[in-house]
Amino acid sequence: MGVGAKTSLVAYAGLLSQYERANVIGTKDFGEILRRHVLDSLSCLLFTPLKNARKVGDIGSGGGLPGIPLAVALPDAEVTLFESTGRKAEFLRYAVKELGLANVRVVNARIEESARDDDHRGKYGVCTARALARLSVVSEYSLPLLRRGGHVVAMKGRVDADEWTEGGRALKTLGGRVSEEIQVHYLPDVEQGERRLVLLEKTEETPEVYPRRTGTPARNPLGAK
Protein backbone atom coordinates (compact mmCIF):
# COMPACT_ATOMS: atom_id res chain seq x y z
CA MET A 1 0.00 0.00 0.00
CA GLY A 2 1.44 3.36 -1.05
CA VAL A 3 1.92 6.55 0.92
CA GLY A 4 -1.20 8.10 -0.64
CA ALA A 5 -3.40 5.23 0.51
CA LYS A 6 -1.98 5.35 4.03
CA THR A 7 -2.59 9.10 4.15
CA SER A 8 -6.21 8.54 3.06
CA LEU A 9 -6.75 5.96 5.81
CA VAL A 10 -5.46 8.35 8.45
CA ALA A 11 -7.66 11.12 7.02
CA TYR A 12 -10.67 8.79 7.13
CA ALA A 13 -10.02 8.01 10.80
CA GLY A 14 -9.95 11.75 11.39
CA LEU A 15 -13.32 12.20 9.68
CA LEU A 16 -14.85 9.53 11.90
CA SER A 17 -13.46 11.14 15.05
CA GLN A 18 -14.57 14.67 14.16
CA TYR A 19 -18.00 14.12 12.61
CA GLU A 20 -20.72 15.72 14.76
CA ARG A 21 -23.99 15.20 12.89
CA ALA A 22 -24.37 11.55 13.90
CA ASN A 23 -22.67 8.95 16.08
CA VAL A 24 -21.50 6.67 13.29
CA ILE A 25 -18.97 4.52 15.15
CA GLY A 26 -19.47 4.78 18.92
CA THR A 27 -16.16 6.49 19.80
CA LYS A 28 -14.42 9.76 18.98
CA ASP A 29 -10.94 8.60 20.01
CA PHE A 30 -8.74 8.94 16.92
CA GLY A 31 -6.19 6.32 17.97
CA GLU A 32 -8.85 3.77 18.83
CA ILE A 33 -10.65 4.38 15.55
CA LEU A 34 -7.44 3.91 13.57
CA ARG A 35 -6.30 0.77 15.41
CA ARG A 36 -9.52 -1.04 16.24
CA HIS A 37 -11.64 -0.10 13.25
CA VAL A 38 -9.73 1.15 10.20
CA LEU A 39 -6.78 -1.25 10.42
CA ASP A 40 -9.05 -4.11 11.49
CA SER A 41 -11.04 -3.61 8.29
CA LEU A 42 -7.93 -4.32 6.23
CA SER A 43 -7.76 -7.84 7.67
CA CYS A 44 -10.33 -8.75 4.99
CA LEU A 45 -7.46 -8.61 2.50
CA LEU A 46 -6.17 -11.89 3.94
CA PHE A 47 -8.67 -13.48 1.53
CA THR A 48 -7.34 -13.64 -2.03
CA PRO A 49 -10.81 -13.37 -3.70
CA LEU A 50 -11.19 -9.89 -2.23
CA LYS A 51 -7.80 -8.73 -3.51
CA ASN A 52 -8.90 -9.66 -7.04
CA ALA A 53 -12.49 -8.39 -6.79
CA ARG A 54 -13.78 -5.87 -9.30
CA LYS A 55 -17.20 -5.25 -7.71
CA VAL A 56 -17.55 -5.21 -3.91
CA GLY A 57 -20.67 -4.65 -1.79
CA ASP A 58 -20.34 -3.63 1.87
CA ILE A 59 -23.53 -4.58 3.72
CA GLY A 60 -24.65 -2.53 6.72
CA SER A 61 -21.69 -0.25 6.14
CA GLY A 62 -22.42 2.07 9.10
CA GLY A 63 -19.48 4.46 9.23
CA GLY A 64 -17.92 2.82 6.17
CA LEU A 65 -16.28 -0.20 7.74
CA PRO A 66 -14.79 -2.16 6.12
CA GLY A 67 -15.94 -0.66 2.81
CA ILE A 68 -14.06 2.64 2.78
CA PRO A 69 -10.66 1.24 3.88
CA LEU A 70 -11.05 -1.49 1.26
CA ALA A 71 -11.92 1.08 -1.42
CA VAL A 72 -8.72 2.94 -0.53
CA ALA A 73 -6.65 -0.25 -0.65
CA LEU A 74 -8.33 -1.51 -3.86
CA PRO A 75 -8.61 1.54 -6.14
CA ASP A 76 -9.48 -0.59 -9.19
CA ALA A 77 -12.53 -2.13 -7.47
CA GLU A 78 -16.02 -0.62 -7.60
CA VAL A 79 -17.27 -0.51 -4.00
CA THR A 80 -20.93 -0.04 -3.05
CA LEU A 81 -21.75 0.90 0.55
CA PHE A 82 -25.23 -0.33 1.56
CA GLU A 83 -26.59 1.56 4.59
CA SER A 84 -30.23 1.85 5.62
CA THR A 85 -29.88 4.63 8.23
CA GLY A 86 -30.15 8.07 6.67
CA ARG A 87 -27.70 9.91 8.92
CA LYS A 88 -25.05 7.25 8.49
CA ALA A 89 -25.54 7.29 4.72
CA GLU A 90 -25.13 11.07 4.85
CA PHE A 91 -21.77 10.62 6.60
CA LEU A 92 -20.71 8.04 4.02
CA ARG A 93 -21.39 10.46 1.16
CA TYR A 94 -19.49 13.18 3.02
CA ALA A 95 -16.49 10.89 3.63
CA VAL A 96 -16.43 9.65 0.04
CA LYS A 97 -16.40 13.25 -1.21
CA GLU A 98 -13.74 14.41 1.28
CA LEU A 99 -11.46 11.48 0.45
CA GLY A 100 -12.01 11.79 -3.30
CA LEU A 101 -13.04 8.16 -3.71
CA ALA A 102 -14.29 7.95 -7.29
CA ASN A 103 -14.68 4.17 -6.99
CA VAL A 104 -17.35 4.30 -4.24
CA ARG A 105 -21.12 4.80 -4.30
CA VAL A 106 -23.57 4.88 -1.40
CA VAL A 107 -26.98 3.18 -1.43
CA ASN A 108 -29.36 4.35 1.31
CA ALA A 109 -31.92 1.53 1.41
CA ARG A 110 -32.76 -1.64 3.32
CA ILE A 111 -30.54 -4.45 2.13
CA GLU A 112 -33.53 -6.73 1.56
CA GLU A 113 -34.81 -4.21 -0.99
CA SER A 114 -31.43 -3.78 -2.68
CA ALA A 115 -30.95 -7.54 -2.94
CA ARG A 116 -34.20 -7.79 -4.93
CA ASP A 117 -33.24 -4.89 -7.21
CA ASP A 118 -31.98 -5.94 -10.65
CA ASP A 119 -29.27 -3.27 -10.40
CA HIS A 120 -27.69 -5.21 -7.55
CA ARG A 121 -28.93 -8.81 -7.48
CA GLY A 122 -26.29 -11.19 -8.79
CA LYS A 123 -23.91 -8.36 -9.67
CA TYR A 124 -21.15 -8.60 -7.02
CA GLY A 125 -18.01 -10.70 -6.85
CA VAL A 126 -17.48 -10.10 -3.12
CA CYS A 127 -19.63 -8.80 -0.28
CA THR A 128 -18.40 -7.81 3.16
CA ALA A 129 -20.16 -7.56 6.52
CA ARG A 130 -18.43 -6.43 9.71
CA ALA A 131 -19.97 -7.49 13.04
CA LEU A 132 -23.39 -7.23 11.40
CA ALA A 133 -25.46 -10.24 12.43
CA ARG A 134 -25.50 -14.02 12.81
CA LEU A 135 -24.09 -16.00 9.90
CA SER A 136 -27.55 -17.09 8.78
CA VAL A 137 -28.73 -13.48 8.57
CA VAL A 138 -25.56 -12.27 6.84
CA SER A 139 -25.99 -15.11 4.34
CA GLU A 140 -29.57 -14.16 3.50
CA TYR A 141 -28.61 -10.51 3.06
CA SER A 142 -25.54 -11.15 0.92
CA LEU A 143 -25.85 -14.28 -1.22
CA PRO A 144 -28.60 -12.81 -3.45
CA LEU A 145 -26.22 -9.94 -4.31
CA LEU A 146 -23.45 -12.28 -5.45
CA ARG A 147 -22.85 -13.78 -8.83
CA ARG A 148 -22.37 -17.55 -8.78
CA GLY A 149 -18.84 -18.28 -7.55
CA GLY A 150 -18.77 -15.03 -5.56
CA HIS A 151 -17.77 -14.75 -1.91
CA VAL A 152 -18.82 -13.11 1.34
CA VAL A 153 -16.24 -12.02 3.91
CA ALA A 154 -18.06 -12.08 7.25
CA MET A 155 -16.04 -10.34 9.97
CA LYS A 156 -17.09 -12.02 13.18
CA GLY A 157 -16.12 -12.32 16.81
CA ARG A 158 -16.76 -15.58 18.59
CA VAL A 159 -19.05 -18.00 16.72
CA ASP A 160 -20.71 -20.66 18.86
CA ALA A 161 -21.86 -24.11 17.77
CA ASP A 162 -25.50 -23.07 17.41
CA GLU A 163 -24.59 -20.23 15.07
CA TRP A 164 -22.46 -22.55 12.91
CA THR A 165 -25.30 -25.09 12.70
CA GLU A 166 -27.94 -22.47 11.93
CA GLY A 167 -25.67 -20.83 9.37
CA GLY A 168 -25.00 -24.14 7.66
CA ARG A 169 -28.72 -24.79 7.22
CA ALA A 170 -29.27 -21.30 5.85
CA LEU A 171 -26.40 -21.59 3.39
CA LYS A 172 -27.74 -24.90 2.07
CA THR A 173 -31.09 -23.23 1.38
CA LEU A 174 -29.51 -20.12 -0.18
CA GLY A 175 -27.02 -21.94 -2.42
CA GLY A 176 -23.79 -21.40 -0.53
CA ARG A 177 -21.19 -22.94 1.75
CA VAL A 178 -18.44 -21.99 4.20
CA SER A 179 -15.22 -22.22 2.20
CA GLU A 180 -12.59 -20.89 4.62
CA GLU A 181 -12.06 -19.46 8.10
CA ILE A 182 -9.20 -17.39 9.48
CA GLN A 183 -8.46 -16.45 13.09
CA VAL A 184 -6.79 -13.01 13.07
CA HIS A 185 -3.98 -12.48 15.57
CA TYR A 186 -3.10 -8.87 16.38
CA LEU A 187 0.11 -7.45 17.83
CA PRO A 188 0.15 -7.39 21.66
CA ASP A 189 -0.21 -3.60 21.87
CA VAL A 190 -3.39 -3.57 19.76
CA GLU A 191 -6.44 -3.88 21.98
CA GLN A 192 -8.82 -5.93 19.89
CA GLY A 193 -11.41 -8.54 20.71
CA GLU A 194 -11.44 -11.92 19.05
CA ARG A 195 -11.57 -11.54 15.27
CA ARG A 196 -12.62 -14.39 13.03
CA LEU A 197 -13.02 -14.04 9.27
CA VAL A 198 -15.49 -16.45 7.69
CA LEU A 199 -15.46 -16.77 3.91
CA LEU A 200 -18.71 -17.92 2.33
CA GLU A 201 -18.98 -19.02 -1.30
CA LYS A 202 -22.05 -18.91 -3.52
CA THR A 203 -22.16 -22.27 -5.28
CA GLU A 204 -25.71 -22.23 -6.68
CA GLU A 205 -28.22 -19.59 -7.69
CA THR A 206 -30.19 -18.26 -4.73
CA PRO A 207 -33.94 -18.96 -4.97
CA GLU A 208 -35.93 -15.89 -5.98
CA VAL A 209 -37.89 -15.87 -2.72
CA TYR A 210 -34.77 -14.75 -0.83
CA PRO A 211 -34.17 -12.44 0.85
CA ARG A 212 -37.52 -12.47 2.57
CA ARG A 213 -39.51 -9.33 3.43
CA THR A 214 -37.74 -6.43 5.09
CA GLY A 215 -36.99 -7.25 8.73
CA THR A 216 -37.85 -10.95 8.48
CA PRO A 217 -34.27 -12.31 8.19
CA ALA A 218 -33.27 -10.64 11.48
CA ARG A 219 -36.52 -11.48 13.32
CA ASN A 220 -36.73 -15.07 12.12
CA PRO A 221 -33.26 -16.26 11.06
CA LEU A 222 -33.20 -18.82 8.28
CA GLY A 223 -32.04 -22.18 9.62
CA ALA A 224 -33.06 -21.51 13.22
CA LYS A 225 -34.99 -24.21 15.03
What are these regions (language model features)?
Residues T165-K225:
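SAM/dcSAM-binding transferase cores
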Residues M1-G57, R87-V104, R213:
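Class I SAM-dependent transferase core
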Residues L146-R148:
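Helix-to-beta-strand junctions that scaffold the AdoMet/dcAdoMet cofactor pocket
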